[in-house]
Amino acid sequence: MAREFSLAKTRNIGIMAHVDAGKTTTTERILYYTGKIHKIGETHEGASQMDWMAQEQERGITITSAATTAQWDGHRVNIIDTPGHVDFTIEVQRSLRVLDGAVTVLDAQSGVEPQTETVWRQATEYRVPRIVFANKMDKIGADFLYSVSTLHDRLQANAHPIQLPIGSEDDFTGIIDLIKMKAEIYTNDLGTDIREEDIPAEYVDQANEYREKLVEAVAETDEELMMKYLEGEEITNEELMAGIRKATINVEFFPVLCGSAFKNKGVQLMLDAVIDYLPSPLDIPAIKGVNPDTDAEETRPASDEEPFAALAFKIMTDPFVGRLTFFRVYSGVLQSGSYVMNTSKGKRERIGRILQMHANTRQEIETVYSGDIAAAVGLKNTTTGDSLTDEKAQVILESIEVPEPVIQLMVEPKSKADQDKMGVALQKLAEEDPTFRVETNVETGETVIAGMGELHLDVLVDRMKREFKVEANVGAPQVSYRETFRASTQARGFFKRQSGGKGQFGDVWIEFTPNEEGKGFEFENAIVGGVVPREFIPAVEKGLIESMANGVLAGYPLVDVKAKLYDGSYHDVDSSETAFKIAASLALKEAAKSAQPSILEPMMLVTITAPEDNLGDVMGHVTARRGRVDGMEARGNIQVVRAYVPLAEMFGYATILRSATQGRGTFMMVFDHYEDVPKSVQEEIIKKNHGE
């Protein structure tokens, strides 16, 4: 089957915004006007087409980036709806990775909000061209020009209106097109009846002023237009549109539009702007990758003639077809039933069926072409960020960066039946979401889940209950402490038991010294003259290892200690392996009295990114958490603080930072090293573990 839409007539866009800016409603209207749905679903009624998970409909927020395909003005528009909540940033990142352009939705009353800054920053990193839609013009307090000013002040964006609203709040009746210099007046509730008229007299001066500003701003991005502008020649509408398109695709200019998705105003004009100003796959640089055999850099231009190359950007479990792998095709053509190479894993995969998704309904298709976004059934080994390529022309595309999880909780199944189901459920959820990790704590036997924030883990535990019918208790997280010796000492372990028949006898002298950090336990046999027979030496080492697992202070493993067995004695009849194991453990216990045992705690390297205004708060947070600042760096009006902070003090920090910075602050943390716990904290830990 031939291509239905050429590459030039394809748009891959994302819709991104702060929570509650009306992003999902905007997507709904796009689907309505492009003929994908016949009845509009309202988010506040829990009936939205794109928000198809039960939790999303209940909470009224978008959690997973649902992909859908629509048609407008002879073009195919693939849309990815992304979440606006900070706990779900991986969803935003992975959708930005496969998009060619985006629509940033603002609430016209609030303008740029904290999470808008976060997603804008991510989009800038990925060099994604954007248009801005100031939504909710019908809302009390809506102010279009204020919203535009926040784009300049908070994002330093070269953003300019290409439209102006006629009225606002309840009087929002239409839109002035600053390119055509005409007014679009809405005459019915569904926004399908639009009258084009002359600009109302009271708006003519404002329209002329903003048209002039627009022409000047666009001319500044293009030398030819600048010459015409300076020489006083008229710039035609066609030249102006071409200039806006070029500057937008180069991420030098951001056109701003207005409307009210809820009241069905401005959405069709926004769709026109998607076609007019956002890039097709042909307008953006060819994707780069590495040849797995030669390590040489290769590019894959958007073309059906090139070898097949795609990136898997999302895994989802569908109740009817099972595991779905969403992928973006960068080059080439793929038929269902064919084989591809997962070059990231070095595994061959068979593409069972190919589905085009519309939120959570699907249509089976035979072929996908370059520039398409689709979902495949039947891939066994593919995870987020993997490259899928032609077997004969392999390439590894740049993957998706996954932030480390920052919060963890213990989960415990309520019954034996739940235990088996929980393992399967957690594995499936971890496959779908790379920021969700599952670990079993070897020391406590507990299952610990880690994620990007409390809401993130709430939603996953909730999904475990709903989708997999697993009942589980969720506990508070625990820290993995360690113990060590800080001084050298010598100790004797003497064990003797004689009570008729064969007795027990073991006698050892061991020197204990602190070892380098991370070196673990080292055992040295320095026995001379057979005072401890050779066959009992392994028993001494084993006795020490077993005792060290339970520590000497609070039950945590003893690490980084050297033990040198240098003297002892034995009994011809009564000595045994068991006796020497016990003697070794007694020597360790004795050594603990003089070897200055200490509890160690994991120290995290924490990187906190926050607005300059909140720098004082952030420094206060670090100090209050027994942390120490390692360095600071200014990036525009954002400050990046690096600090070492104990893991024990970081629980709940995501929530504290979020409220201190109104969601504008983010942090990442990675384990760095173990460090001695202060004496006062050590005493508390010992008391707690001894049940005092």
UniProtKB/Swiss-Prot annotation:
Annotated GTP binding lies at: 17-24, 81-85, 135-138
**What are the entry keywords?**
Cytoplasm, Elongation factor, GTP-binding, Nucleotide-binding, Protein biosynthesis
Give the UniProt subcellular location, in the record's own words.
Cytoplasm
* Domain called tr-type G: residue spans: 8-282
Q: Which GO terms describe its cellular component?
A: cytoplasm
Q: Name one GO molecular function term.
A: translation elongation factor activity
Q: Where does the protein principally reside?
A: cytoplasm
**Which Gene Ontology BP terms does the record give?**
ribosome disassembly
Family (UniProt): Belongs to the TRAFAC class translation factor GTPase superfamily. Classic translation factor GTPase family. EF-G/EF-2 subfamily.
Q: What does this protein do?
A: Catalyzes the GTP-dependent ribosomal translocation step during translation elongation. During this step, the ribosome changes from the pre-translocational (PRE) to the post-translocational (POST) state as the newly formed A-site-bound peptidyl-tRNA and P-site-bound deacylated tRNA move to the P and E sites, respectively. Catalyzes the coordinated movement of the two tRNA molecules, the mRNA and conformational changes in the ribosome.
**What name does this protein carry?**
Elongation factor G
What species was this sequence derived from?
A: Streptococcus uberis (strain ATCC BAA-854 / 0140J)
